[in-house]
Amino acid sequence: MTTATAGLAVELKQSTAQAHEKAEHSTFMSDLLEGRLGVAEFTRLQEQAWLFYTALEQAADAVRASGFAESLLDPALNRAEVLARDLDKLNDGSEWRSRITASPAVIDYVNRLEEIRDNVDGPALVAHHYVRYLGDLSGGQVIARMMQRHYGVDPEALGFYHFEGIAKLKVYKDEYREKLNNLELSDEQRENLLKEATDAFVFNHQVFADLGKGL
């Protein structure tokens, strides 16, 4: 089956495969998932994630309001608020927002998401949306189990990985891919979306690289 007949979802998977593999197997994430780090490092990851999810969801709000990809940009996927509740738990209720310092990679990531928001760039937003949320619906479930197994993280601090508004994850993911395939895009928009998705994985890899510095 060629990408031309397979649809955008398959094109995205194929065109981002190398960047996805690199991000997924970063040293930081490998160490975290294999039990070589600790709750402190997991907390740092989630704090940085809160910064870029906040920016991502503000961009999604702007694009959704424009009428582009409304059904795809489902607010049930939003993670920033539940992530904040997790961080309250991980920080034992102490104030954490004011002490977070965005890493250089997160600054770059957030700047790009804010640019997408300001330009109401629907295809670019969909690329970042796909990379983050489809990953959360898939590999995120593994991360939650590993955080409990290796570090004893309280399940109440892992709400980020549980999508309360989504009953069946596989069905939802299949529907998400079908919505991707049904997007009306020009050839230029499609090409830009595919490139942006690879860029999104690169941003994520750089975030993990920054987190791994000094360990």
UniProtKB/Swiss-Prot annotation:
Signal peptide: none
Gene3D superfamilies: Heme oxygenase-like (1.20.910.10)
Keyword entries, A-Z: Heme, Iron, Metal-binding, Oxidoreductase
PROSITE patterns referenced in this protein's UniProt entry, alphabetically: HEME_OXYGENASE
This protein's encoding gene: hmuO
MF terms in GO: heme binding; heme oxygenase (decyclizing) activity; metal ion binding
Source superkingdom: Bacteria
Family, similarity comment: Belongs to the heme oxygenase family.
Residues that coordinate or bind heme b: H20
Source species of the chain: Corynebacterium diphtheriae (strain ATCC 700971 / NCTC 13129 / Biotype gravis)
PANTHER family: HEME OXYGENASE (PTHR10720:SF0)
Gene Ontology BP terms: heme catabolic process; heme oxidation; response to oxidative stress
Role description: Allows the bacteria to use the host heme as an iron source. Involved in the oxidation of heme and subsequent release of iron from the heme moiety.
Catalysis: reaction(s): heme b + 3 reduced [NADPH--hemoprotein reductase] + 3 O2 = biliverdin IXalpha + CO + Fe(2+) + 3 oxidized [NADPH--hemoprotein reductase] + 3 H2O + H(+)
Name this protein carries in UniProt: Heme oxygenase
InterPro entries to which the protein is assigned, alphabetical: Haem_Oase, Haem_Oase-like, Haem_Oase-like_multi-hlx, Haem_oxygenase_CS
EC number(s) given by UniProt: 1.14.14.18
